[in-house]
Every structure is written in structure tokens, then in C-alpha cells.
Amino acid sequence: MARRYWDINLEEMMGAGVHFGHGTRKWNPRMAPYISGKRKGIHITNLTRTARPLSEACDLVFDAASRGKHFLIVGTKDKAADSVASAAIRARCHYVNKKWLGGMSTNWSTTETRLHKFRDLRAEQKMGRFKRLPKRDAAMLKRQLSHLQTYLGGIKYMTGLPDIVIIVDHQEEYTAIRECLTLGIPTICLIDTNCDPDLADIPIPANDDAIASIQLILNKLVLAIREGHYSYLGSH
């Protein structure tokens, strides 16, 4: 896999607060190699140890996208949800930004059934069939559709398991990570100083609580995915 230049700038990362970790009492000793020191009771991430895996991750997703592979971006906490949806839409990826439903990937047949139901309800609503139903029945179907939109809206076009999963805050998304490990799906994870880097295929040490930090990391990955997509389209 060829290395490319992704304009990963240490000053830019510092400006976004990528280097700020958690309080020194809330840390995972396995993160020690990525920590450069302490400041006012919090750990500081060594940004050179962030730049390297971020560049590696960009190379990986570019290469995968250039071969037509599919991505899923996961980040369900409030500070990440909007950034995850925005990044996924720009990169034409699938996303989960509300709640990871247990078994979403390991019990794919059930998820697929829910997606078929979701698509059918959307089609019925667009064709105006809800309006021809009794009010009680129409209200029940609208509630079902709203529920499915909330939890499956970001994966409504998925037809199979993703090739790579990008995860924001792997403490929050532990269930998703365990499912990826079970299925052997490669993961790229933002890992803060309280995380276990060994659970990710490519751990990117970064502040996973600051919106600016999350957006910076996702923006780099999105750029690489988009360039990979263009390369794929240009060769087909």
C-alpha cells in the first residue's frame, strides 16, 4: 500500500485540542506509549504518535475506497453524533449516530429484516398509503417509521456488512467493537487516554470529547475516502 500525503499538521491538531486527554486518575496504562506528559491534572497525548496512525488510516481507507470497499462510521454520544452524520454523508458512507443496537452486525439477518421493513414503510409513506389507513393504524406505522429512522436511518442503504468500521470513542462503542472483533471487521478508532488501544486495528490517539478534535480526525479520513472513491470511479 503506497503512502500518500494527507496534510496532517501538528499545529492544526493542537489548535483543535486533539492532544488533551482525560484526567490522570481516569487512564488506561496501555495508553502510556501515546502520552507525553501531564498538565493541570490531565494527560497530554503525544501528537506525533497521533499523526503516524492517522496517516496510516488515511492510506488504508484511500486504498479500500479505490477498490470499491464500504465503510461504516460509528459515534453515538451527543458530542460526536452530528459530526459523524456529516462526515458519513460527505464520504458517502453508512453511519450509526444514535444507538448501536446489540447484534447489529453479528446478527445481520435480523438487521437486514429491519432494514427491509424500514424501506417498505418509507415507500408506503411516499406513495401516500398512510393517508388511506384508519388514523390509529397510520399513527402506529408512523411511530414505527420514526423509530427505524432514528436507529437505522444511517444504514438504510446497507446491503451487507461493512469492510471497515471507523469508531469515535471506543469506550462508548464497546459493543460495536466487540462485534467487529468477532466478525474480523477491521476498525479504525479514536482512542482517548482512558481507552485500550489493543482493541483497535488502527488506534488513533486523540481527544474524543472535543467536537473540534473529532471533526479534524474525521475530516482527514473523509478526504482520503472521497479521493479513493474518485479513483475507483475513474477506473470503472
UniProtKB/Swiss-Prot annotation:
Keywords, in A-Z order: Chloroplast, Plastid, Ribonucleoprotein, Ribosomal protein
GO cellular component entries: chloroplast; mitochondrial small ribosomal subunit
Subcellular location field: Plastid, Chloroplast
Disulfide-linked positions: none
Pfam families: Ribosomal_S2
GO process annotations (BP): translation
Organism domain of life: Eukaryota
GO molecular function: structural constituent of ribosome
Chief location: plastid
Family: Belongs to the universal ribosomal protein uS2 family.
Protein name (database record): Small ribosomal subunit protein uS2c
